[in-house]
Amino acid sequence: MSNSIIQSPDLGDVTGYLRDRIRTVPDWPQPGVMFRDITPLLQNPKTLRVLIDVFVHRYMDQNLDLVAGIDARGFILGSIIAYELNLGFVPIRKKGKLPFQTVAEEYELEYGSATVEIHADACKPGDRVLLIDDLIATGGTMMAGRKLLERLGATVVEGGAIVDLPELGGSKLLQASGLSLFTVCNFDGH
């Protein structure tokens, strides 16, 4: 995983610049959780451009076919990256949200389970796909998204996210499964 400092002549430490603009909301959605809110990155045109440029520069020469984004904030980031790279975008949705024939993958949550789905014709065998989400916590959602894409015959080149919460173990789990990861920054705790 790459959390190295990204440098820019205009901004200096781009990683720090973006990290400093992520809002921390204590005790949301439940007591003890420090929620990492990326909406300030999206609301400011300069930070949004810097954020997207970090991903575009990383992936512009990777010979990708598609970008897949995980419901819901992965849609925002993933679709813009796909547009900038002149690629198609594939939504990975929560169960029951896609209108056509789907393939589903269940994954475990802290208290129970959830399911994500992808259209059965979302990609074809051999497609090289970048998988995007806003944040890696336990890794369950990104792992499920990867499994869906691979079941359709695609190769997930890398998983990308803005934030990694390494103490929750998701990035370690994903890397142990063989998935290469890129995150812009990380935060301690959850």
From Swiss-Prot:
Its main location: cytoplasm. It is an enzyme of class 2 (transferase). The keyword Nucleus does not apply. GO terms for cellular component: cytoplasm. Coiled coil: none annotated. Belongs to the purine/pyrimidine phosphoribosyltransferase family. Catalyzes a salvage reaction resulting in the formation of AMP, that is energically less costly than de novo synthesis. This is Adenine phosphoribosyltransferase. It comes from Cupriavidus metallidurans (strain ATCC 43123 / DSM 2839 / NBRC 102507 / CH34). The lineage of its organism: Bacteria, Pseudomonadati, Pseudomonadota, Betaproteobacteria, Burkholderiales.
